[in-house]
Amino acid sequence: MSQLSQQRILSGGSPFACKVCGKLFSHKSNLTEHEHFHSREKPFECNECGKAFSQKQYVIKHQSTHSGEKLFECSDCGKAFSQKENLLTHQKIHTGEKPFECKDCGKAFIQKSNLIRHQRTHTGEKPFICKECGKTFSGKSNLTEHEKIHIGEKPFKCNECGTAFGQKKYLIKHQNIHTGEKPYECNECGKAFSQRTSLIVHVRIHSGDKPYECNVCGKAFSQSSSLTVHVRSHTGEKPYGCNECGKAFSQFSTLALHLRIHTGKKPYQCSECGKAFSQKSHHIRHQKIHTH
């Protein structure tokens, strides 16, 4: 801080105050930069990738990601970071510190950004909108992953079989096919699952819990994904379009089945006669011919 700035504050002079949040600044230029937060204006652009920021200090920090320089190293595990605040956040993994606590449910987080994102599960806020289909998301990373559906990008590849996925979570789910690991077991019926979320959804079969209710007709569902698909029956939304013929579908799984018409893929083969089918339901129906 300059001597003039110090004198201004110590003398009780007129610092520059933000009209939105009341934060005080010793220079008008600092106030102007701060106000970009509220206006969401991002006048500072990275020359390398074009990413824009509200303050100059953030673009300077960001530019270190292009240089590859990582000056800040963790003394516990040796991992290095290009920015000091990223190191400080990382070190909380080792200390177990979670200073940001949700007032609604008490869950604590390492980063404030994670708390803000979590709080949207209580408020239902989904501020990130897909420009292609209008679907909304609570986090920007969720939107980014979703957008890969529209561009057909599949950057996550299985090392075992080569199957590629648009989202990392789907690759992780898929990999359990190869390992066969199912560590999550239902106390009611003993059925085991490879993922905890799958167990939680399954338990609702026993409890009858249906926490996701349609605002239009009141129908309730055990899974949020089921509610999302159901709502499209009211809105008529069909976000999944076929690149071959243009036909659109309300569910991605339905699009995947439809695509087999164009590719000719028939993964379900009858063990009795060898006839192959593109859909599992057709395969099951066919097998009844042999049992009768």
Curated annotation (Swiss-Prot):
Region spans: Interaction with TERF2IP: 212-292
Zinc finger residue ranges, C2H2-type: 16-38, 44-66, 72-94, 100-122, 128-150, 156-178, 184-206, 212-234, 240-262, 268-290
UniProt KW Cell inner membrane keyword: no
Tissue specificity statement from the Swiss-Prot or TrEMBL entry: Expressed in heart, brain, liver, lung, skeletal muscle and kidney, and at much lower level in spleen and testicle. Expressed in lactating mammary gland.
Assigned keywords, A-Z: DNA-binding, Isopeptide bond, Metal-binding, Nucleus, Repeat, Ubl conjugation, Zinc, Zinc-finger
Location(s) in or outside the cell: Nucleus
Crosslinked positions (Glycyl lysine isopeptide (Lys-Gly) (interchain with G-Cter in SUMO2)): K28, K51, K56, K173
Lineage top rank: taxon: Eukaryota
One CC-aspect GO term: cytosol
Disrupted-gene phenotype: Mice lacking Zfp146 in mammary gland display impaired mammary gland development. They cannot sustain full growth of their pups. This phenotype is associated with an impaired mammary gland development noticeable only after mid-gestation.
Pfam families reported in the protein's UniProt record: zf-C2H2
Family: Belongs to the krueppel C2H2-type zinc-finger protein family.
Summary of subunit composition and partner proteins: Binds DNA. Interacts with SUMO conjugating enzyme UBC9/UBE2I. Interacts with the telomeric protein TERF2IP.
PANTHER family named in the record: KRUEPPEL-LIKE TRANSCRIPTION FACTOR, ZINC FINGER PROTEIN 384
Protein name: Zinc finger protein OZF
Phylogenetic placement of the source organism: Eukaryota, Metazoa, Chordata, Craniata, Vertebrata
